[in-house]
From Swiss-Prot:
Coiled coil: none annotated. It catalyses: a 2'-deoxyribonucleoside 5'-diphosphate + ATP = a 2'-deoxyribonucleoside 5'-triphosphate + ADP; a ribonucleoside 5'-diphosphate + ATP = a ribonucleoside 5'-triphosphate + ADP. Its cofactor is Mg(2+). One of its GO terms (molecular function) is ATP binding. This is Nucleoside diphosphate kinase. Major role in the synthesis of nucleoside triphosphates other than ATP. The ATP gamma phosphate is transferred to the NDP beta phosphate via a ping-pong mechanism, using a phosphorylated active-site intermediate. It is found in: Cytoplasm. ATP binds at residues 11, 59, 87, 93, 104, 114. GO terms for biological process: CTP biosynthetic process; GTP biosynthetic process; UTP biosynthetic process. The lineage of its organism: Bacteria, Pseudomonadati, Pseudomonadota, Alphaproteobacteria, Hyphomicrobiales. Keywords: ATP-binding, Cytoplasm, Kinase, Magnesium, Metal-binding, Nucleotide metabolism, Nucleotide-binding, Phosphoprotein, Transferase. Its main location: cytoplasm. Its EC number is 2.7.4.6. It is an enzyme of class 2 (transferase).
């Protein structure tokens, strides 16, 4: 098993409902350690840059509006196979398809307001981590 770092974000729908602690606890209970965390209010420009990979998708403008509608909590997680473990704990993008006990099954409101985002690969994790954090902010 490999010790990895991954990026996690608690989205505005969850921060509005004061779920930051509950979601972080679910991540920690799964064996992931938070080694960097901050609460940010993403600007539309930051949302456009962060989600640029989806620029041509029909939901892009709605995604940008949603992600800039309230605070998010951005985190760096560390643990054995952290990328896969985080994705497992998050559950399927559509909460109705998510496994029982996953973050999205428990907390998501809809496929759009699905409470969390997590990196899908090591390359994406590195890009997303460096988008929000400088090396000095990550304390393992």
């Amino acid at each position: 098993m490999a010790l990895e770092r991954t990026f996690s974000m608690i989205k505005p729908d969850a921060t509005r409902r004061n779920l930051t602690g509950a979601i972080t606890k679910m991540l920690e209970d799964a064996g992931l350690r938070v080694i960097a965390s901050k609460r940010v209010w993403m600007s539309k420009r930051e949302a456009e840059k962060f989600y640029a990979v989806h620029k041509e998708r029909p939901f892009f403008s709605e995604l940008v509006e949603f992600m800039s509608s309230g605070p998010t909590v951005v985190q760096v997680l560390e643990g054995e196979n952290a990328i896969a473990k985080n994705r497992e704990v998050m559950g399927a993008t559509n909460p109705s398809d998510a496994e029982e006990g996953t973050i999205r099954k428990v907390h998501a409101l809809s496929i759009g307001e699905n409470s969390v985002h997590g990196s899908d690969s090591a390359e994406t994790a590195k890009t997303e981590i460096t988008f929000w954090f400088s090396e000095i902010e990550i304390v393992g």
